[in-house]
């Protein structure tokens, strides 16, 4: 199976190239890209499931003289297989959606830029490269191979973000994303150099320039390089912090998230779903993989991850509440859910540090299951937002409304995703959050003072995040899908076609299925959580049994209530069949003929909550002064830009740009001097290599 694991990424690259080469025939290119990407992803999903059911960890190493320390080493273990599941699964679903989405863009393209036709082939090339590189990131077992795959993933997603580069929004988002991802990569390079140096120090025979050079940067070398000892502790702590910053930039933890609410709205909706659903999770994978190199975690590692998770979750959902753009709102909710995952991982690390195996297993299990759950419901929500945007031409919620009547299946699917991300039973988001709650409660009730403090912090943060998320998606669904249409475009919306609906309904069904099968998901996930927690596999069943029983009881009760509600709804429909049913308006508060403008807007709905956190959000308000007693018109608008971007990163980037502009004299346009620069650089590298 380890050799076959390379087949799906290779097929994805081949399919992307074929779609690109047939770009002059957009219908063929679109069909080839969608069908090929779906088939290759489903093949990868099948092989991953077979690997999970098969023997233990497998590895393969091939000679690769790309650079010092490089080897083409890949591996399959439970952690790799776990992350391959959402990568391949969501890639297949998004590829199907992309077929209908890009086809509709091609048919509607009247811009003169060719965004719907000439770019179809390149869009599928970058999409397939993104899916293949994400798979290679989690398969890689060598630092050089990992970084190559990481850069391909970053650049292909950047090319997708800037695909409609004639738009200023896309260009600006692309610059922000590219700068952020390269900063993160710089930290990762330093981290791997530290690990490689530690590996060389622990085994001097492995010289970086000897015949064993590939082994120096192999992950197997890292795993034994930082064992117990006073000298290893500072190095392990430095590696942990470097990984948290480097991988956290990709994951979108606060305050390194600033690229995320810019890039996700600019990308096509199926790409936004893939980036938010699985690409940012490669950051979580990276942190977990590095933890396997470092041995027993220090307590402050768990506290750091828990604090970062709580801050990311709360700040992410607060900024989501203040947004008007539905895709920007969903992007901030990705920050929130990365925070929830980090809370679970932080609880797990604290459990390991303080020798509380139940806390550790439940924390890791909840965080890992939320990786899968977030991929499902966030993919669904981005696809639903894309279908609404496709039908109306706008992402502004204040220009939508009344879509439930016009797009009922899209509305039902979006509602399922909204309920799941809000953590409502019996859907999947509830299950993973409940596991983290159970781990935190166990720490409070059974652990010492540190576990109790950590558990209380997690419980408070999760409770606040859950309440704010429910309010935010009440706003998102209500403003967009309920009420009356606010614009002619919303009034003229039509239900999405089958190519857009089927992926959404599949993901909505997955939200329900994982929620109902939550106890079984815990049993399947427990061995991986136990491996991360350093718990013996034979003791796992006893550790999770109380949690499994409680989860089963809550899930069955919620499912029973859902079935009862469905039965009562069906009974109502049957009783009304064949009878005349009168319809009348609800209480209108004295306004017999309300105008669409009399509805809540997205900002007015959220104002009671955003007003409480005005000091953090710093919303900008613009209004037209009123001077007449009976004004004929008025205007009021709000905007909530990211305070971290505005207050920290934008000044930092401006300062760096100003400093670098002093080197502009090097860019003089004289070709012969550019050749001299290259020759000088090659000479320096040659001297360094020979020394």
Q: Predicted segment positions?
A:
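N-terminal signal-anchor/start-transfer transmembrane helix
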Residues: 7-25, 245-248, 252, 313
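Hydrophobic transmembrane alpha-helices and their helix-loop junctions in integral membrane proteins
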Residues: 93-107, 121-146, 156-495
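Transmembrane helix-loop-helix hairpins at membrane boundaries of multipass inner-membrane proteins
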Residues: 1-6, 17-125, 199-231, 527, ...
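Aromatic-capped, Gly/Pro-kinked transmembrane alpha-helices
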Residues: 520-563, 571-691
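Hydrophobic core of alpha-helical transmembrane segments in multi-pass integral membrane proteins
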Residues: 13-17, 37-48, 91-92, 192, ...
């Amino acid at each position: 199976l380890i050799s076959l694991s390379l087949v799906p990424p290779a097929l994805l690259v081949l399919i992307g190239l074929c779609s690109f080469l047939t770009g002059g025939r957009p219908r063929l290119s679109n069909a080839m890209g969608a069908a090929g990407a779906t088939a290759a992803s489903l093949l990868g999903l099948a092989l991953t499931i077979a690997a999970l059911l098969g023997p233990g960890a497998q590895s393969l190493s091939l000679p690769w003289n790309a650079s010092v320390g490089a080897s083409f080493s890949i591996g399959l273990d439970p952690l790799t297989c776990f992350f391959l599941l959402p990568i391949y699964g969501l890639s297949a679903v998004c590829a199907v959606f992309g077929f209908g989405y890009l086809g509709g863009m091609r048919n509607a393209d009247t811009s003169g830029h060719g965004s719907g036709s000439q770019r179809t082939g390149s869009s599928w090339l970058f999409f397939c490269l993104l899916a293949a590189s994400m798979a290679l990131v989690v398969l890689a077992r060598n630092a050089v191979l990992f970084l190559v795959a990481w850069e391909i993933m970053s650049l292909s997603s950047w090319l997708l973000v800037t695909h409609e580069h004639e738009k200023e929004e896309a260009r600006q988002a692309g610059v922000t994303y590219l700068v952020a991802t390269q900063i993160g990569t710089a930290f990762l390079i330093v981290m791997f150099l530290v690990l490689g140096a530690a590996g060389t120090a622990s085994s001097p025979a492995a010289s970086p320039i000897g015949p064993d050079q590939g082994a120096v940067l192999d992950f197997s070398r890292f795993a034994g390089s930082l064992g117990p000892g006073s000298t290893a502790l500072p190095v392990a702590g430095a590696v942990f912090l470097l990984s948290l910053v480097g991988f956290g930039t990709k994951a979108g933890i606060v305050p390194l998230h600033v690229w995320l609410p810019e890039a996700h709205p600019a990308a096509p909706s199926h790409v936004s779903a893939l980036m938010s659903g699985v690409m940012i999770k490669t950051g979580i994978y990276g942190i977990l993989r590095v933890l396997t190199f470092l041995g027993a975690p220090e307590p402050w590692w768990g506290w750091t991850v828990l604090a970062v998770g709580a801050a990311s979750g709360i700040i992410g959902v607060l900024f989501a509440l203040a947004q008007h753009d539905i895709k920007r709102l969903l992007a901030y909710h990705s920050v929130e859910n990365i925070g929830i995952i980090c809370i679970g991982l932080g609880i797990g690390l604290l459990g390991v540090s303080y020798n509380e195996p139940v806390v550790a297993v439940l924390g890791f299990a909840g965080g890992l299951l939320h990786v899968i759950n977030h991929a499902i419901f966030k993919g669904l929500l981005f696809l639903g937002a894309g279908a609404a945007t496709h039908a109306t031409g706008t992402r502004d919620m204040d220009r939508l409304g009344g879509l439930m009547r016009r797009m009922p299946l899209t509305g039902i699917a979006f509602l399922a995703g909204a309920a799941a991300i809000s953590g409502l039973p019996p859907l999947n988001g509830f299950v993973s959050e409940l596991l983290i709650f159970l781990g935190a409660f166990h720490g409070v009730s059974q652990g010492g003072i540190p576990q109790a403090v950590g558990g209380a912090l997690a419980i408070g943060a999760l409770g606040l995040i859950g309440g704010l998320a429910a309010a935010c998606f009440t706003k998102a669904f209500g403003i967009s899908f309920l009420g009356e249409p606010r614009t002619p475009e919303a009034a003229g919306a039509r239900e999405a076609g089958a190519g857009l609906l089927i992926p959404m309904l599949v993901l909505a069904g997955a939200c329900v299925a994982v929620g109902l099968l939550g106890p079984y998901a815990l049993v399947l996930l427990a061995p991986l959580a136990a491996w991360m927690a350093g718990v013996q596999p034979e003791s796992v069943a006893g550790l999770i049994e109380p949690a499994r029983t409680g989860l089963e009881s809550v899930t069955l009760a919620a499912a029973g209530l859902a079935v009862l509600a469905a039965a009562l709804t069906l009974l109502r429909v049957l009783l009304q069949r064949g009878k005349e049913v009168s319809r009348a308006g609800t209480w209108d508060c004295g306004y017999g003929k309300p105008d669409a403008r009399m509805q809540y807007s997205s900002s007015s709905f959220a104002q009671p909550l955003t007003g409480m956190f005005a000091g953090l959000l710093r919303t900008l308000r613009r209004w037209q002064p009123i001077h007449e007693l009976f004004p004929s018109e008025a205007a009021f608008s709000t905007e909530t830009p990211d305070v971290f971007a505005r207050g920290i990163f934008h000044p930092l980037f401006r300062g760096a740009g100003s400093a670098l502009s002093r080197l502009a004299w090097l860019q003089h346009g004289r070709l012969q001097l550019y050749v001299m620069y290259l020759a000088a650089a090659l000479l320096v590298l040659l001297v360094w290599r020979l020394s």
